């Protein structure tokens, strides 16, 4: 029996609140059950040095967790003086995922930075961050089109992400912390709205998984992402 009696292919309740802060060009509070992440999009009329003069833009991301977003307080990375390997891995994943949804040439020579700050963690913080940041990025780019900065939208479609895994011998979708900590296999899948995959990260924490189990997990991820896309579309269609 899963927590909250969820079906094996059922994500946690997803809530996406747009325009959550007033200063950023795009801002979202995304909630996957008890995991909550604030995602903001900042537009700047400049690009990294390696892209100057090349006529294309850039999308990047930063990720962090508040000290008491977890069960016990952890030190701020700023207090340690450096980012941890996990943080750098996650923010690179977020950035790669979001760049896949944007035509960088059509964006022009400007940068958009997505800041993903976890305020409460209960598993799946990276997948929630990608899902929420996608909506914040969409709002920021739509604003550029509406104010005439961009003539056409560089958006290629939505991006969503979900965790899947094998827990107690059963393949399940969208693991919360108690499931994630007990999983024999843990996988994160990032998908485009058209069904193409951007990234698959899978690890056997216990027993190795079979090819058949891999296909089962990917199928679960597709079902989960389709439900997440529905939540994103509903949020973007809502009047705020």
Swiss-Prot record:
Binding annotation for phosphate: 86, 124-126
Family membership: Belongs to the RNase PH family.
Subunit and interaction comment: Homohexameric ring arranged as a trimer of dimers.
EC top class named in words: transferase
GO BP term, pick one: tRNA processing
Protein name in the entry: Ribonuclease PH
Cross-referenced PANTHER family: EXOSOME COMPLEX COMPONENT, EXOSOME COMPLEX COMPONENT RRP41
Enzyme Commission numbers on file: 2.7.7.56
Role: Phosphorolytic 3'-5' exoribonuclease that plays an important role in tRNA 3'-end maturation. Removes nucleotide residues following the 3'-CCA terminus of tRNAs; can also add nucleotides to the ends of RNA molecules by using nucleoside diphosphates as substrates, but this may not be physiologically important. Probably plays a role in initiation of 16S rRNA degradation (leading to ribosome degradation) during starvation.
One GO MF term: tRNA binding
Reaction catalyzed: tRNA(n+1) + phosphate = tRNA(n) + a ribonucleoside 5'-diphosphate
Species of the source: Mannheimia succiniciproducens (strain KCTC 0769BP / MBEL55E)
Top-level lineage group: Bacteria
Keyword set, alphabetical order: Nucleotidyltransferase, RNA-binding, rRNA processing, Transferase, tRNA processing, tRNA-binding
Matching CDD domains: RNase_PH_bact
């Amino acid at each position: 029996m899963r927590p909250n009696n969820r079906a094996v292919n059922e994500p946690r309740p997803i809530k996406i609140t747009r325009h959550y802060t007033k200063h950023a060009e795009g801002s979202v509070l995304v909630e996957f059950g008890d995991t909550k992440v604030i995602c903001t999009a900042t537009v700047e009329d400049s690009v990294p040095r390696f892209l100057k003069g090349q006529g294309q833009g850039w999308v990047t991301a930063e990720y962090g967790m508040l000290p008491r977003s977890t069960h016990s307080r952890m030190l701020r990375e700023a207090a340690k003086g450096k980012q941890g390997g996990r943080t750098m891995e996650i923010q690179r994943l977020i950035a790669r995922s979001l760049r896949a949804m944007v035509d960088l040439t059509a964006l022009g020579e400007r940068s958009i930075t997505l800041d993903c700050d976890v305020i409460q963690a209960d598993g799946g913080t990276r997948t929630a961050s990608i899902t929420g940041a996608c909506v914040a990025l969409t709002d920021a780019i739509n604003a550029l089109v509406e104010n005439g900065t961009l003539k056409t939208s560089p958006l290629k479609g939505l991006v969503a992400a979900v965790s899947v895994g094998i827990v107690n011998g059963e393949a399940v979708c969208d693991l919360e912390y108690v499931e994630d900590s007990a999983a024999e296999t843990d996988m994160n899948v990032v998908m485009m709205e058209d069904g193409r995959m951007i990234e698959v990260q899978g690890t056997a924490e216990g027993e190795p998984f079979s090819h058949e189990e891999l296909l089962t997990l990917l199928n679960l991820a597709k079902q989960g992402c389709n439900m997440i896309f529905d939540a994103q579309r509903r949020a973007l269609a809502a009047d705020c």
